[in-house]
Amino acid sequence: MKKYLFLTLALLMGITTMTAEKKTKLSVSRVDPTDWYVGMKNPQLQLMVYGQGIRDVQTVTTDYAGVRVDSIVRLDSPNYLLVYLNLRDARPGTMRLSFKPAKGKPVAVDYQLRQRAMAGSERHGFDISDVLYLLMPDRFASGRTDNDQIAGMNAYRNDRSQPSLRHGGDMEGIRQHLDYFNELGVTALWFTPVLENNSPDAGGFSTYHGYATTDYYRVDPRFGTNEEYCLLIREAHARGLKVVMDMIFNHCGFEHPWVADMPSKDWLNAPEWLSEKSSGRDPMTGFGEGSSGSKYLQTSYKLTPVVDPYASDVDLKETTEGWFVPSMPDLNQRNPHVMRYLIQNSIWWIETAGIDGIRMDTYPYAFREPMAQWMKELNAEYPNFNTVGETWVTEPAYTAAWQTSPDPSEGGECHAESRHPSFGGAGGGPTYLKTVMDFSFFDKLNQAKHEETDGWWQGLNRIYNSFCYDYLYQNPASVLAFIENHDTDRFLADGHDATMLKQALALLLTVKRIPQLYYGTEVMMNGTKEVTDGNVRCDFPGGFPGDSHNAFTRQGRTEQEQQMFAWLSKLLHWRKGNEVITRGTMKQFIPYGGVYVIARQLGGRTVLTVLNGTSAPATMQVVRYAEVIGATADALDVTTGRRYDLTRDVELEPRQSLVLEYVKVE
């Protein structure tokens, strides 16, 4: 009996030993970035290595010429290791990294170092000469149906009848309509995020919008592949179109591997409530309680504490550390390893895909100082590149506080640090962010459309007053203006007022701003968010198989759609290369008699935007505008081709807009 007992114990010990060895077997399943580029101004490269037991390797070595292992960082999770390399003297090629455990065989990983396509200074971003066209890939056009259902992804379905589920648009659908953008006259395309969002549908909602990233180095396969994305950008460039990539540093998606296996305890903000013992938590929409009793921390969505010089700690914490929604964990940019990962990711997409700009989502929700470091590094590497930050507060003073105009001659260094001496609760110093979004313009214009322009504050007076604060901006010409986007009601709401829409667009495209359009405005798409955001993100007519209505072609548009398309297209093509708009001075006149006038001037050439801000006929009394008209007798309305005699008063129909072009005669 003792003999059998001994054998049984021996077998059990052997099984236990083998199981332990199996559990600790070293493996490398992923390295981020997937590859890298030599010749960067910053020679440091962070590799995030993921694999079973990888944290506890004894050494990481390489014999690749010009590469040095500077340090390795062991995180809380046994499945992550950060390797910091110096590539200062490296050349393109395949580098082999060896990960040696304390016991057992080392694991070797081949890693590609690539040649850059061009120097960073050769990459030119968007600016005031451009018109950005914002679209949602899932809602614009479908060029393939074989990517509608991807095996292995979390449960989802395509259903075009449901405004908050996926509809099946993709990169190929956009690529097939590149000529449409040229016909319209826009010069840059901004797609809402295209990276993988592997979140399950829940409660009739999905992450079709792209703002819950689960893989920072992979295009969502329902949109296409990385190769298809790069092809789309190359073909856009061949047609003179720039491409702006939407990024999110503030948060990731709940299904990102960082959530289930957090690299370190401080990788996320307010992670305490996440635990296996949490009960009753819906990963998409629910709340929960951690095993320690900690509660889910929700952001307040109030951005003012970030600039408030009197901000309380609790308010600032809720803004910057609270989660946007339960399905979007808040990233901790104060952790330098998190920020290095994100910075490198933005650089990787610039180098790999050749994007021409970045739109950074929820910019003030992230910690200001790490974000400023990102912008400083990006501006140094790409001095002519541009990034726009979403800064959603409708007061110009708030928006202007985020803009810092860097001096390219100083390698991206800020030349006006005194403009940001304190920056409220978030600390001081420049942001290095070149472009901000003009939510004041959006807000005031959408109020004015419902009002009569009186002698004081109503109607277009709101726009006039908003522009008065341009002195707060370091560079007003690098502020992005819009009348609607994917997060707002459509400008038309549930209506079809073409005259009002033309007035808004005439203003948008002639003031001292970078203008941004939203897909479908050119064919008068409307809708409100009253029920769901999906109702302002409807499918573009003709973009999907089986559509009976095709707004991509003149023949397929209704008469009203064609009239708006033709009017806007004419204005957009006129704006291209028009230096009066891109370089000229701007002068505005207080609305008088319900009429608002803005003049753009350059070397005698003048563009006069004239808006009747009332629902009744009005008169532009030319004598009031003598300083910008002079003795000019003849002006051309560029949208209609009609000529106006500026020696006489101009009669305007209700809500009429004119864009008059002339050479000023003294």
Label for each model-derived stretch:
Residues F140-I347, T352, M371-E381, T391, ...:
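Substrate-binding/active-site clefts of carbohydrate-active enzymes
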Residues M40-K103:
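Immunoglobulin-like IPT/TIG beta-sandwich domains and homologous Ig-like subdomains
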Residues Y133, L189-F191, V243-M245, I358, ...:
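Hydrophobic faces of well-ordered beta-strands that scaffold small-molecule active sites
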Residues P476-H496:
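Active-site clefts of carbohydrate-active enzymes
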Residues E21-R55, L113-R116:
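Beta-strand/beta-sandwich contexts
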Residues M1-V28:
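Bacterial Sec-dependent N-terminal signal peptides
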